[in-house]
Design a protein with these regions (language model features):
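Bilayer-spanning, highly hydrophobic alpha-helical transmembrane segments
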Residues: 12-45, 163-224, 402-479, 488-505
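Short, charged cytosolic
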Residues: 138-159, 380-395
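Hydrophobic alpha-helical transmembrane segments in multi-pass integral membrane proteins
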Residues: 261-263, 318, 501-512
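Juxtamembrane boundary at the C-terminal end of a transmembrane helix
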Residues: 504-529
Length: 529
């Protein structure tokens, strides 16, 4: 098969060379509009090519670890190499990895390569570490007893992922601090450049200040997002979505519609009051999303007890009904009610696969969904469910440890963010007040010409910066914590309310403290001959 990596690299290099040559020609001939169009098109094409190339994983991730655990679990039963590949190929939740295994199966069945040769061919189209995994899996696929190979491979990859996750958490901690530092520095960049307008008489500096500050914040957020592990917490069954998720989807359009009255309030009463209205609107969907996420986290915390209990009981009886009745006596927290429903279903004759699938849908947990699927596949191939339960339970415990470490780091970033957000708003409000003061007092000095600060631009720029920092801060907190994307709406709502309150408080403080003094100073400077 053609090497996708080499093809993509060649396309990227070709686009870069052509765009540089065409851009130089247009620049020399003075066709600046054409230059902008060509660079925009080239940038879009490069972005799409990089996006396609990014789909080929180049580092260890959660899906790869789960894939190996899945193969190791079902290898405890009577299974052939063809079936090992088929199970992974049919599990579309593995994304790109599932596509590769589908290619292996297609080469082996339709073109007569055989599983081992097909695996070798497909390995050449991937990147490490997945490429290395496929090369080593050739030994497992050529063996009559692949369990030993897969045990070593899954345990090794789990340890590597553990090390990667620890390093990623340290990177999140460091980059979170750097992001917080730059968010405060960005405001001072704007303030210094705006004040320079008075002495340089170049109003265009104001635009440059907001451009630099916003660009720095966006770059820092992208850098943080690049190092964050892409864990999946939520699983949504399209046919049977959980009630908490349905509530969230119901109130989300209402919150989005409330941005219209928030804009009207901003026009009539002022921007800070519009922020308060918009923040209050986003609190409701954010609250439902946060409660939904906490429910899933609670389910995950009790799931290791459930899966180990099911494995212990079904290893001897092979009856899901008896296993669930036994596990119901254990302390399962938020899983208890879900398990009672599962027990009621299995009592009236619902089959095991349907029962556990419905349990996964109601739990809305990706961990529960994948572990239940592995458990069912292992059961269908006659695996030792006692061992399978231990494997899946231990993997869930490791995932919980990772989540708690990540949450501890995220809390530090969260505290810093909620502290810096109002400070940023206060400084921008002071900047607006000082700009108006300079315009009204310093421009009347006869022996020196002072520049006029464009206060209208500053007002719009401040609103833009507050909205940008609010959104980026909320997304940064979401990336640091992981979890459900809807929880970022709660952060947006809280930060908008905090920003509006800080703006109102800063305006009141400036008017109360310096309003009279600045008014008298303005009268004095106006009387200077």
């Amino acid at each position: 098969m053609a090497n996708r990596l080499a093809s993509l690299k060649n396309r990227i290099v070709l686009v870069v060379i052509i765009s540089i040559l065409v851009s130089l020609f247009l620049f020399v001939t003075g066709e600046f509009i054409g230059l902008i169009v060509v660079d925009s098109v080239a940038g879009t094409v490069l972005f799409l090519l990089f996006f396609i190339r990014k789909r080929i994983p180049s580092k260890i991730d959660q899906q790869l670890v789960l894939l190996l655990i899945h193969m190791y679990s079902i290898s405890h039963g009577e299974i052939k190499p063809d079936d090992l590949v088929k199970v992974i190929a049919e599990t579309k939740d593995y994304g790109y990895y599932s596509e590769v295994f589908s290619g292996i199966l297609k080469l082996a069945k339709e073109y007569g390569y055989g599983i081992t040769k097909a695996t070798s061919e497909m390995a050449e189209t991937t990147k490490p570490p997945f490429k290395d995994v496929l090369i080593r899996c050739q030994q497992a696929f050529s063996s009559t007893n692949p369990k030993g190979y897969l045990e070593l491979e899954s345990s090794t990859m789990s340890e590597e992922y553990s090390g990667y996750y620890d390093r990623a958490i340290k990177s999140i901690d460091m980059l979170g601090g750097v992001y917080s530092t730059f968010s405060s520095v960005a405001v001072f960049i704007i303030m210094i450049l705006d004040i320079l307008v008075v002495f340089t008489n170049t109003p265009s500096i104001v635009y440059f200040g907001y451009l630099v500050a916003s660009s720095v914040l966006i770059v820092m957020y992208v850098g943080l997002k690049a190092v964050v592990p892409k864990d999946v917490l939520i699983h949504i069954d399209k046919d049977l979505p959980p009630q908490q998720y349905t509530r969230f989807k119901t109130v989300l359009p209402i919150a989005c519609a409330c941005t219209v009255p928030a804009a009207l309030v901003s026009i009539i009463y002022g921007y800070p009051y519009g922020f308060l209205v918009a923040g209050a609107a986003f609190l409701l969907p954010g609250y439902y999303a946060y409660k939904f996420e906490m429910f899933v986290v609670g389910v995950n915390e009790n799931y290791p007890t459930l899966i180990k209990g099911l494995g212990e009981n079904m290893a001897s009886s092979s009856s899901l009904q008896n296993a669930i009745s036994y596990v119901l006596y254990l302390e399962l927290g938020k899983l208890k009610d879900l398990l009672k429903r599962a027990y009621a279903r299995v009592k009236i004759g619902v089959d095991n696969a349907k029962t556990l699938t419905l349990l996964s849908s109601e739990a809305a947990s990706h961990t529960v969904y994948m572990a239940n699927k592995m458990f069912l596949d292992s059961f269908s191939y006659g695996a030792d469910l006692l061992e399978v339960g231990k494997i899946l339970g231990n993997n869930c415990v490791k995932s919980l440890e990772f989540s708690k470490k990540r949450e501890a780091v995220a809390k530090t970033i969260e505290a810093t963010t909620f502290l810096l957000q109002p400070i940023t708003v206060v400084l921008l409000t002071v900047l607006t007040f000082m700009s108006k003061y300079f315009n009204s007092t310093l421009t009347s000095v006869p022996y020196f010409t002072f520049g006029t600060i464009p206060t209208v631009v500053i007002n719009i720029g401040n609103v833009f910066m507050i909205l940008l920092t609010t959104i980026l801060n909320a997304l940064t907190l979401k990336e640091a914590r992981g979890g459900f994307w809807g929880s970022s709406l709660l952060y947006i709502g809280l930060l908008l309310i905090l920003s509006g309150a800080a703006w109102i408080g800063a305006q009141a403080m400036m008017n109360l403290t310096f309003g009279g003094a600045f008014g008298n100073l303005q009268q004095i400077t106006a009387n200077i001959p």
